[in-house]
Amino acid sequence: MGIGSEMLHKPGTDHVSILLSIAIALLMLFSLTLGRYPVPFADVARIVFTTFPINAVGDYENAPWVVVEIVRMPRILLVTLCGMGLAMSGAAMQGVFRNPLVGPEIAGVSSGAALGGVAAIMLSWPPLAIVGLAFGSGLGALAAAFALARLTGRASTLALVLSGVIVGGFCGSLVGLLQTLADPLVKLPSIVYWLLGSFAGATYEKVAVVAGVTLFAGAALLALRWRINLLSLGETDAAALGANVEALRWGLMGLVALLVAAQVSVSGGVGWVGLIVPHLARMLVGPEHTRLLPTSACLGGIYLLAMDDIARSATEQEIPIGLLTSAVGAPIFAFLFWKTQSKGWMRE
């Protein structure tokens, strides 16, 4: 199969990323108005455009300024970055494995990061230490999956997938064990809430961590977008066109692991974003990754930010965002699967 018309972008997609970028900026401003302490949109715009970049000395006696700059701004930035990273990861993984059912959690990174986060909570470590251990554990899970795949003698797609399932299952069992051993009055509620996913603990330090990882890994994925297109054609065709399939696949999975580990480390479990958002982006711009990756990033930021707005504004008590992304994502994915099942992954 050659790079046919399906690999070309759809008509009118040149402006999609621009429109989505404008939409995400407006949604971020609107999100700053939401919450238990309402702040009018005009006040939000004034605060943002007069104090950004963030001043070292702020007006801490001004309640709206504190709410917007100190409480809501880091959360909204963190949510947006995580949504963008997860969506780009999902789009890349679906291209690498030529399978629309693949998500960025396939290598066991999410479970590994969850194990690190739970262990840090059990040890009463401070928030940034939880982020660090969760991030390191996620990368450790990826290394374990790679090593296990190597034991098969051939790093095939199937070996990588099965290795990720094995490592993820093992890490999940350890998480369950730690929950069983946790103090039911103090530690267990914190662990359960963290695993369900929440951005309530967002800080500018966490934003800096995720921003650094997202900029690095996202830029690397964009630089490799043409190579991902080759992998989407299949291993044989990609190799015939000059791609080092094994090295490229492993490198891409490493970049995805960085993004997923960064997200889990700051917010706990947030699923379905990397699975459904690339499908929506593909419906807008087609499967060609030079447009699919940036479009997925914008849609991912919009989707997760909208879910977080609902999570913190719909009820008196904040809803764990992982519950919302699952509750909304599952029926959306079911609809997309029904809509596209007869069309296949890539049309001839």
PLM regions: where:
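Alpha-helical transmembrane segments in inner-membrane proteins
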Residues: 2-348
